[in-house]
Amino acid sequence: MAELGLNEHHQNEVINYMRFARSKRGLRLKTVDSCFQDLKESRLVEETFTIDEVSEVLNGLQAVVHSEVESELINTAHTNVLLLRQLFSQAEKWYLKLQTDVSELENRELLEQVAEFEKAEFASSNKKPIIDITKPKLVPINEGGTTELLNKEILRLQQENEKLKSRLKTIETQAVNALDEKSKLERVLQDLQLDQGNQQDFIKAQDLDDLENTVAALKSEFQKTLNDKTENQKSLEENLAAAKHDLLRVQEQLSMAEKELEKKFQQTAAYRNMKEILTKKNDQIKDLRKRLAKYESED
């Protein structure tokens, strides 16, 4: 259909609609003609009429014709709505959204093209068109194999999208929980380190008290020896030197004990488990962040 730019199938659909419209128009014109014929047969029986009688006849005819024309216009509008509804229903089954340009309905050039097409199409027959009662309806396109596959694919994609959204939400929840658990573990580790420091401080304080008591005792003994001016001064000096050596040895032992305590604490199962848990949680957080970045890039 070169004039309207439609393919053969759509051309046949347009011709069928034109045939239907011409038939309805012909029936309505017959009705209008019958109004005038009824008026002639029922009212125009006198040879002369007064002005009032003529006005009454014309007013009655006007009312009848007005009613018939109005009824036809309303019916035509409703018919066009039903036709659009059929087309839109088919489009929606393909997940399409059609648009109409109402301003084109008053395009004189296009209207003339349609008139020429109608004239050329129906010029070969002088008979008035007859409504094709057996005219087939629009076939629902969802019965075809292609449409069924398309609908299934759309449904599958929608379901997959919902699954991805749910999975992303689950991953986000896991990430938040992992961060919370990491924070808790860090606080526990800090508490353990603080307890360790307190224990070391307690041990240091206790050893220092012992050393101070020992030194004080030695000083007291040395002072007593000096005051007594006994002949054991040399022995006392040796004892003092030995005490100093003992002090250094005790200090060294204290340092070694501190290192040993720290080493033993690091070798304890609680410390190793805590360190292993923190390492695993850090790895999980890194993995979750990578996965979140991957899903964000896909969206």
From Swiss-Prot:
It comes from Rattus norvegicus (Rat). The keyword Chaperone does not apply. Regulates ciliary localization of the BBSome complex. Together with the BBSome complex, controls SMO ciliary trafficking and contributes to the sonic hedgehog (SHH) pathway regulation. May play a role in neurite outgrowth. May have tumor suppressor function. This is Leucine zipper transcription factor-like protein 1. PANTHER family: LEUCINE ZIPPER TRANSCRIPTION FACTOR LIKE, LEUCINE ZIPPER TRANSCRIPTION FACTOR-LIKE PROTEIN 1. Self-associates. Interacts with BBS9; the interaction mediates the association of LZTL1 with the BBsome complex and regulates BBSome ciliary trafficking. It is found in: Cytoplasm. GO terms for cellular component: cilium; cytoplasm; cytosol; manchette. The keyword Lyase does not apply. GO terms for molecular function: identical protein binding; protein-containing complex binding.
